[in-house]
Amino acid sequence: MSTVSSTNTTQQAAAPPKGRTTAQNIGLILAFIVLGVILLLPTPETLSTGGHRMIGVLAFAIILWMTSAVSYPVSATMITALTALLLGFSPNPEAPAKMLGTANALMLIISGFSSPAMILVGAAMFISVAMRKTGLDRRIAMLVLSSVGTKVSRIYLGVIITGLILAFFVPSATARIACLAPIIIGIVENLGIERKSRVAALLMVGAVQADTFWNIMIQTAAAQNLVAVGFMQTQMNTSVSWIDWLTAAAPFSIIMVIIAYFLTQALIKPEFKELVGGDVQLAKMRKEIGPMSTDEKKLLCISIGLLALWATGGKLHSIDTTTTTIIAIALFFFPKIGIMDWKFAQPNIDWGSIVMFGAGIGLGTVLLKTK
């Protein structure tokens, strides 16, 4: 059974902060300049003052993200603070003679943290940690990779298939890549492949690209899908079930993955076509995993049960996706039948990504409400 260690996290926390680059400083200054210019422009008659200011905040955020001027979690706090101030001192749409107020503006921007999509992202982080703690993700990968052969193209295909399997159980691309990346690095090292080689780049880049398309195919694979489902329910009065989504999106996703499979190999040409002795190494890696542990079995049962509830939602029962996911996470921590405790999970969760998702969803909500 593999375990997740917080040693790296501790070392990173203890290490001195790296200096900022000139490009980052320019990006930060540019973001504020663009924000200021937009705020100084006259407000169009068809746009509210709040909507005008939020366009400025959106431009500010995009520049921060494009230039990596600050980390994503830090950008989330900046977006939240700017929204609370700029929107708070804007006229209240319901009573134009009064200001909206910073408290009301803050409630709007942090509403993203209570959205079903946000909860799904947070839950995905816990599922990812559970996968890595028990080693179930590595077992799945080894079962697939030891069956596809030793050609680089086959190993690449195995990585893509592993990503597909994880997409059914881990509802976030970020969390899935957190599972896949260490596995791919382990495969590269155990098979004697150079980390800086094109083969290693192909496996890593290809896994991420394919995962993007699996996001589209499976409703619970990404938070933005639930945002879209919620929008269709409120704006179009249309409900889309998990199965309906899969049926509609699968053809497109599969075609795009096939295109990406061949295109990435053409753009990142491997140095060699087959790994000599790779079958022996893969068999050895699979054997090292050993028999399935009790925690792996528990996680597998919970994951299959969760997938079944997702797939039958709206058909056999009326429990929403977010509630079923929270139930599964609760089972992870339940005494005796659980697979981890909070002390283990807390340092291994990517809280920064959760903060970023919450602020991003909140920003989208505010943009919709400030017309």
Language-model segments: which ranges?
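Membrane-embedded alpha-helical segments and adjacent helix-loop junctions characteristic
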Residues: 43, 74, 78-194, 352-353, ...
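Alpha-helical membrane-protein architecture signal
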Residues: 56, 106, 158, 162, ...
